[in-house]
């Protein structure tokens, strides 16, 4: 076969921190100086387990909606929107290293309880119900993240995970038009 194993093995051991030349050129560190760094697979697994915000369904009208009337939906609760509540930086420890994870929502998949659904990247959505009933509304959030290990810069995590809100039952009623005069 031939060729070099890692690089030219004629390196000067004195300039390689006292390591034999082949180990210095192949990136080996002496015992006690090694830094074990978690890989993308470990970071992605931790990201999927950090307890991301599940979301909460809000609507206008809030308590009851009506057939043929637009109902506006958004994700959040009294404390803020889903993005504001869920996108804070978190730190986990993997293989002895501090890993900072910055999650962010990339899409919202709404299910309106009448068979209708809509996927959006942000903001409010509007839906018009065609029939009366108790509608089980939910939203699934798709998350991605950036991460940094130790003092390194942030980079894309290269994957996604999802969380789904608790179902919110929204009563939808028929409205009767009343004419006066």
PLM region spans:
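Extracellular/lumenal mature domains of secreted and surface-exposed proteins
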Residues: 1-181
């Amino acid at each position: 076969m031939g060729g070099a194993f890692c690089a030219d093995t004629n390196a000067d051991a004195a300039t390689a921190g006292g390591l034999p030349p082949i180990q210095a050129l192949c990136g080996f560190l002496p015992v006690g100086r090694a830094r074990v760094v978690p890989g993308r697979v470990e970071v992605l697994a931790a990201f999927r387990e950090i307890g991301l915000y599940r979301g909460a369904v809000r609507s206008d009208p809030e308590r009851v909606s009506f057939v043929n009337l637009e109902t506006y939906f958004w994700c959040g609760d009294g404390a803020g929107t889903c993005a504001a509540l869920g996108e804070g930086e978190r730190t986990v420890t993997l293989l002895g290293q501090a890993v900072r994870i910055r999650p962010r929502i990339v899409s919202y998949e709404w299910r309106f309880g009448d068979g209708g659904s809509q996927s959006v990247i942000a903001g409010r959505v509007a839906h018009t119900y065609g029939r009366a009933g108790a509608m089980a509304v939910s939203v699934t959030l798709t998350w991605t993240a950036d991460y940094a290990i130790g003092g390194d810069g942030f980079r894309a995590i290269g994957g996604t995970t999802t969380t789904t809100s608790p179902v919110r039952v929204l009563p939808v009623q028929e409205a009767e038009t009343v004419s006066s005069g």
